[in-house]
Amino acid sequence: MRTLIVDDSAFMRMAIRSMLASSPDIKIVGDACNGKEAVEKAKSLHPDVVIMDVNMPVMDGLTAVKTIMNTSPVPIIMFSTLTTEGSKEALEALHLGAIDFTAKSESHHDVNKAEKELVDKIRNIHSSNPNLLRLINMRKFKGEVVRGKWRCAGDFGILIGSSTGGPSSLEQVIPRLPGDLPAPVFVVQHMPEGGFCRQMAERLNFLSELEVKEARNNEKVTAGIVYVAPGGYHMTVRKALDVTRIKLIKSQPVHAVMPAVDVTAESMLAVYGKNIVASILTGMGFDGASGFKTIRDAGGSTIACSEDTCVIFGMPKAAIEAGAIDVVKPIFEIPEEIVKRLEAKCNGK
């Protein structure tokens, strides 16, 4: 993987080189000390991935991300103290087209963790679709809200799972779901603990007819609300005395992530049974494959994003190969498919 390092600190550029030195499959093709240099070298060096700081002179990282994604799109990983969990800069970078972020840290333990995260993300990045990232930025919010005709009896639930590339993909799906949706929507986006998921929920809420919020422990579940799992917790649903509530669980990661799609899927099955419509959008690994297979086997509907419109095809591919998916659709058709399948279930078809 041809990698370009962008950071205004010579020490940090050297530190990143050191982090990647033990990985022979990762080749450093150059470095830059500001965003302007990054834009120029992204054009001339044709890297497979760019590691980008945020706070730099001449041109900051966010401006550089926007410029690169408009001129010579390439997967970008933000790597900065300003992109710690929950940071507004991290969300803005992802909105502008960056594919993921990893936070710098000062402690030895966290430095080792950041090194592993960075190497893993670079190695998986080759399966991303940089032209799609540019396309998503150009097409955001242009699709109309999809309307349905509901005659519902019973409880229904919608599950959406995503990881790397998820924030931009979610912005293609959630804002196109109608405000009168007769089911709650549970979103599991892989993110570490912190305020990031809350910031993402607030942005989606601004863009959507539906109310979008970060889930709170023990809150009552209501149709027409999108619940985003907070980072660092598994999100489950439980029904007692005819009331469904969210239970946030602080336990061990599943598939090395928390929240995990599979955990939410299994808990939803106990509450909603076959009355589930579930969609997996993008991400590395295989989280969601097991839970979606269980949902499908129980009579629920499952949807995966197509490879040609998926940022990272790992999670959808794993679910497809596990026999867990009913239909594969382009990202821009997933809102219609969710509404169509929920409408069919509500109307007893």
Curated annotation (Swiss-Prot):
Subcellular location: Cytoplasm
Residue ranges occupied by any CheB-type methylesterase domain in the UniProt entry: 158-345
Modified residues (4-aspartylphosphate): 53
Pfam family, one: CheB_methylest
Active site as annotated: 163, 190, 287
Gene Ontology MF term list: phosphorelay response regulator activity; protein-glutamate methylesterase activity; protein-glutamine glutaminase activity
GO BP: chemotaxis
Function statement: Involved in chemotaxis. Part of a chemotaxis signal transduction system that modulates chemotaxis in response to various stimuli. Catalyzes the demethylation of specific methylglutamate residues introduced into the chemoreceptors (methyl-accepting chemotaxis proteins or MCP) by CheR. Also mediates the irreversible deamidation of specific glutamine residues to glutamic acid.
UniProt GO cellular component terms: cytoplasm
Species of provenance: Methanosarcina acetivorans (strain ATCC 35395 / DSM 2834 / JCM 12185 / C2A)
Coiled coil: none
Protein name: Protein-glutamate methylesterase/protein-glutamine glutaminase 1
Family: Belongs to the CheB family.
Catalytic activity, reaction form: [protein]-L-glutamate 5-O-methyl ester + H2O = L-glutamyl-[protein] + methanol + H(+); L-glutaminyl-[protein] + H2O = L-glutamyl-[protein] + NH4(+)
PANTHER family assigned to the protein according to its UniProt record, in alphabetical order: PROTEIN-GLUTAMATE METHYLESTERASE/PROTEIN-GLUTAMINE GLUTAMINASE, PROTEIN-GLUTAMATE METHYLESTERASE_PROTEIN-GLUTAMINE GLUTAMINASE
Post-translational modification: Phosphorylated by CheA. Phosphorylation of the N-terminal regulatory domain activates the methylesterase activity.
Domain notes: Contains a C-terminal catalytic domain, and an N-terminal region which modulates catalytic activity.
Main location: cytoplasm
Domain Response regulatory: from-to ranges: 2-119
E.C. number: 3.1.1.61, 3.5.1.44
Keyword entries, A-Z: Chemotaxis, Cytoplasm, Hydrolase, Phosphoprotein
